[in-house]
Structures are given as C-alpha cells and as structure tokens.
Amino acid sequence: MRPSDYPPAFDPAEVIAAPSDTDPIEVGVLIVGGGPAGLACAIRLGQLLDSAPAVRERLGDVPVAVIDKASRPGAHLLSGAVVDPVSLKKLFGDRKRIADMPFQGFVSHESVYYMTKKKALRIPAPPTMRNHGNYVASLAQLGRWLAEQAEEAGATILPETSGEKLLVTDGRVRGVRTGDRGRGKDGEPLPKFEPGSDLIGQVTVLAEGTQGHLSGAAISRFGLEGENPQVWALGVKEVWKVAKPLDHVIHTMGWPLRGAAKYREFGGSFIYPMGDEMLTIGMVVGLDYRDVELSVHDLLQELKTHPKITRLLGDGERVGWGAKTIPEGGWYALPKQMHAPGLVLTGDAAGTVNVPALKGIHYAVESGMLAAEAIFAALQPGEVVWRPGALAPYDEAVRSGLIGKDLYRVRNMRQVFEKGFVRGAAMAGAATASLGHVPHGRVGGERDADQELISTDRSKNYPAPDGKLTFDKLSSVYLSGNKTRDDAPNHIRIETRVPREMAELWVRMCPAQVYEIGPADAGKVQVVVTPSNCVQCGAITAKGGRLTPPEGGAGPEYTLT
C-alpha cells in the first residue's frame, strides 16, 4: 500500500484561471509570499527603482506589492535556524550592518553527536555542517525585520491575503486571485464576508515557500518539473526558556531514528542557543519514511528523554512550538526552468535548499535578489517583461552563481541515504571528498507518496506527555497561537475512506492532531478531519493529500520560531 494509491480529489488545473473583468487591482510587480525570498526581492527592487524613476513610473501607483497569508509578517515563518549571512550582506551592502539584524548570536563553535538511547558519541563535524561564522536566528523575527526594510524601500505589504488561483491568459501569467474571507464551514458567506480580488501584475514572483500552492500549479501548467521528483522533510521545533544558557550549536544523528534501509528514516536533530535565556530544539525527518507509526512530533518528545538533552533543558519551560516541511530534493529536483512568461519561482518554492549543509535561508534571499535584478532588466525601455525568455537571465544567474554551484556539489547527497544510514553516510563522505562526482551521474528518486508502507510497533516507545518535558500535540498547537476559525471551510483535501493503515499514517504523521480515525465499514475507516488544528506544515501534501490555502489570517502566530 502506498499513499499515492488514495489521491485526493484535486487537479492542479483548478488552481489556474483567467482574469476577471470585474474591478481588478493593478500593481507593478506582484510578490506572493512574505518570507526571505519574497521580501529580499521587494527590497532589491526598491533599491534598483530608487535610481530609475522612469521604470518606477512604468510600474504604476503600486510598483511593488507583497501578499502574505499570515496575519502579520513572520507569523508563518519557521526554521532552525543557523543563517549564513553572505546574501544578507550582499543585499544591504553598507546600508545595514550585521549588528542591525535580529540575530540571536554568532556561532563560534559547534558539536555533532551520534546518539544511542543512553549515550552521545561526539564525532567530527562533516565539512558541510560546519557553521563557524554563521548566526543563529528566529526566522519569524528575521521575517518581521525584513518586512520593515521592504516597506522602507517602497513595497506595499498586504497581510491576511492568500493566493487562491494563478491568473493565466495567452500563455502568460497575469497575476493572482486572492481567497475569499468570511465563509462558513459549508462555504456560505457569513456577515463579515469579503470576496477575493484579482491582483494583476506586470510580473508575478512566487515566493510561497515550501509546498507552494500556486508554485505547484505553475510548475504543472508550464511543464517545469525537474528530472527528479521533489521530496520533503518535516521539521518540528520547540523553543525553551532555560536557566543555563547554551553556548554552542549542536546537531545529532542516529537515535531515535532507525538506520536500516527498510525504514527509510533520514534526519536528525538540532539544538541552537537563542541568547542568554533560551534555546531551540528540533527534529527533522524525511517524509519518504515508510512506517505508519512514525511521528516526528513524538520522536522529538522521545529525543528529549535522552540524558544529554534532559540536562540541557534542566527545569526549563517550553515557550514556543511549530512545524514546517522542507524541500529536500536538491539539484535534480529543481524546476527545469524557474521562469515562465510573466513569472519567476524563488526560494523554497523552487526547492533551493542545501540538505547536507542544513541551509536554505541565504539561498532564498539570494534567489529573491536575482529575481529582482532580472525583472528590473526586463522592465527597461524597449523590453517586454512578460515575453517568452525575458526572465531567462534569472535562471542563468541562479544556476551559475552561489545557489547552483553549492547545490550541484551536493547533487546526490540526499538520495544516497535511501540505502540506509551506514551506507548512506559512507557514500555522503565520498560525495563530499569528490565534490559530488561520486556517485557518478544522477541518482534518481521516488515521490514521498510512492513509498510502500510498513507497520511496526514503533509507537510503544513514545513517552507519555507529562506537561513538563514531554507534550501532546494539542497543547503544542495551542502554543503555536493558531488562529484558524472552527467554522472555517475545510482547506485540506484527502480521501476520507481508506484502509486503516493509511489512516494511521496520517494520524501519526500530522504534528497538530488534524486527523482521527472514525467508524469502520467494509474494510475501510472514515478519516475525521479537524482543519482548525492545522498549522499549515504541508506534510499531508507529501504523503497523499493536499493542503490548499485557508482564508488569509488563519493558521499559526509564530513569534520565536
């Protein structure tokens, strides 16, 4: 049995529409997503337009608009995060210093451990995981700060605005239709109903982040699929207030994950200092795992019972929690083109993540800058920004620059772990030493949803929640500040009558307790969905369902993640 055997009632074509003639809102450059890629694009465009009044005038009254589905900038952003500052330095130049940026601290040293249930063996940090000179950050806080810089650069930011449909006519992207707000559970308009609008831009930048709704539709509509299918990991993260500050970055591998190839459990944990009073701890696991009883949230709770981790947390207090997927396909899963007429794909929406280095934020910033520069060049007199090929220089800059060079060097690193931890670690070492030439050629892959499922008794090892060190899913969702209305329409598409094994996969997988097993009938069970619990992590899209945009302003209210 595979998750892909039970696809949801969803067709990417339903996300594509023609613009309406009814009161469209025209902007110059329309950016979808207020994360590091979209905001870097807005900032760089503002810098370029400052010295080009004719181009600014050509873009109209709203030269740059950023829409974001979160209630405010940063509220849906989550990452580890240790940030390489190279792209932020390039973006701001002399305008901002590192000291001006909301970093939690400088990484001066780090440790990597191979874990067993009771022991932690310190091992040399792989070259790809060395972080000296980088900075620890809360991506939610960094996103808020970047939004302030974007507004100072002249961008208009529209929070609580989801992108529902991609507007396409005559083979080019014209903009985005935003989602309605204020509908009831059955789709009926409520007293405060607000219909969506058509936002028309000369060019549209998709910077939605992981599992982008419009990005996936655009890739399908324009045939941009990469050589390998994209695959994802799920990260679950907690922020703790602790009495004794942590003074270095920690990564772990091994326990509580199992190394045998039959389980396909790829991942590890991170523990980062966040100033004098807090630290962040998280677990990341590839969603190509096979065991229906695996739960990343519960693996994180299990990890915290390790003696080494328990000592770090001490008598601390959990003050933050969140979950998000991460694109892990690498070089061969990048779209074969990151542009189409009137469109560019940036950041996690395009899959620009370096898995062995555990890095994606500076690549998102870099791609946003490169997109801005390509758009600006295509807006010059005599150019037509939406003509076929006008934005091709963006692709060339991504693939030949920092992003492409880094991702190509680690092009098969994620895929070699499909043979298990020991063999994968050996192959990863060879790949690092050979700058990616070993293994030779392209190592293929399968979609996460195409993995054959197995069932074990894995869940018996998960610790019971005690409310002090270990926690259940519902209390964690509460800590995320989730604002989704109980009477909002269901934004999750799944097949609701499936074999029990399939239902158990979704129940365990979801970190927010969205799915429950209902009555059984004729060899199948009913899956009960509670969409108001959803923190929009995107895991269901990787494992057989489909996450669509809820109404703008719904979802988590991340502040420390």
Outline where the language-model segments fall:
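N-terminal FAD cofactor-binding segment of flavoenzymes
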Residues: R44-L48, G60-K117
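Glycine-rich Rossmann-fold phosphate-binding loop(s) that bind the pyrophosphate
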Residues: G33-P36, L139
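C-terminal auxiliary extensions adjacent to catalytic cores
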Residues: F417-K468
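Extreme N-terminal leader/targeting segments of oxidoreductases
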Residues: M1-V29, R44-A65, S476, G481-K483, ...
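Iron-sulfur cluster-binding cysteine motifs and their immediate structural context
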Residues: A503-L560
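FAD-binding beta-loop-beta segment adjacent to the flavin cofactor pocket
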Residues: S4-D5, K324-G351, V355, S475-D487, ...
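Predominantly flavin-linked oxidoreductase catalytic cores and closely associated redox partners
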Residues: E57-G60, A140-W145, Q149-L312, L370, ...
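Active-site-proximal substrate-binding core of FAD-dependent oxidoreductases
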Residues: L59-D61, A75, G351-A357, M369, ...
